[in-house]
Design a protein with these regions (language model features):
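Flavin-dependent oxidoreductase catalytic cores
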Residues: 1-286
């Protein structure tokens, strides 16, 4: 069965430098979702967002921009901006679990407000021809939230819905709710992408067997912890390359060089790399 692998957007990690380094060194990812754009009521696209989406910074990559918002006018503003850059799709983040987002009624904190979701999508589809896709969790407090919102989403021509099979208040703790994801499959007509705890080839195979109708798989933290994972899944192998260490060092050095050139000061650079090292360390026993 053919399938696609997608890189889940992770703030502070999967920027264009990471995307390019991973694609050039390892490959395996079909589509990269860019970390979300957040306007905070100001209709200005920050320079960091601009750099991340510039076509010249994403040459040879399939990239989908993402927005996090609870306001239709913000959505339309960003939709117009990314269309000017040549993008045809905008992903709407209803998945972010962090309190600083959810307390503002955004990310997974918006899933239980079906009326607001309906109002935003209705206005966006009336005033823009951009293709809309969704990135969601099962809810914030419980997995019934998404089940209540899916009938609303079914009334719109969404490209797909990528679902991280946790609720927001879990953050990344505890296990994924596979029964909750199955209920989504049974409830919606939309194409669903699975996201959550794909951290090894064995785990991917397990999920494929569990959800045989799913052909699109999104990898988040597992991709940062093990950048070899997508290509190993695609090649259907459990074996790492013989030159694993050399390949990883080249990947690491590419990232370090690029962040050294773009960030100011040793402290800033080391902090950036430290967060990456926290994930990288999971793939090495020593």
């Amino acid at each position: 069965m053919s399938f696609t692998l997608l890189s889940s957007p992770l703030q502070g990690f999967t920027d264009f430098r990471f995307r390019n380094a991973l694609n050039n060194q390892f490959g395996g990812i079909d589509t990269f979702y860019a970390p979300y754009i957040r306007l905070n009521g100001k209709f200005i696209i920050k320079n960091a967002y601009q750099r991340d989406l510039l076509p010249e910074n994403n040459s040879g990559l399939e990239v989908i921009p993402q927005i996090i918002t609870n306001d239709a006018d913000e959505f339309l503003f960003v939709a117009n901006y990314v269309q000017q850059l040549g993008y045809k799709e905008l992903n709407w983040n209803l998945g972010c679990p962090y309190p600083m987002v959810t307390k503002c009624g955004m990310g997974s904190g918006l899933i239980n407000d079906s009326q607001k979701i309906n109002e935003i999508l209705k206005k966006v589809h009336a005033e823009s021809d951009i293709l809309v896709s969704m990135k969601m969790r099962l809810g914030y407090e419980n997995s019934d939230e998404i089940i209540k919102s899916l009938p609303i989403l079914d009334t719109f021509p969404l490209k797909n819905i990528a679902i991280h099979a946790r609720i927001g208040k879990q953050l990344y703790k505890g296990g994924v709710d596979l029964e909750g994801f199955q209920k989504c499959i049974d409830t919606t007509k939309h194409t669903l992408y699975y996201n959550g705890d794909i951290t090894s080839v064995a785990k991917f195979r397990e999920m494929q067997e569990r959800f045989p109708t799913i052909n699109h798989w999104m990898i988040g933290r597992g991709l940062i912890a093990d950048p070899f994972l997508p290509s190993m899944i695609k090649n259907n192998t459990l074996e790492y390359p013989e030159n694993k260490i050399a390949l990883f060092i080249e990947f690491h050095n590419t990232l370090y060089q690029q962040y050294s050139e773009s960030l100011s000061g040793a402290t800033h650079i080391l902090l950036k790399m430290y967060h990456l090292w926290e994930y990288f360390s999971l793939s090495f026993s020593d």
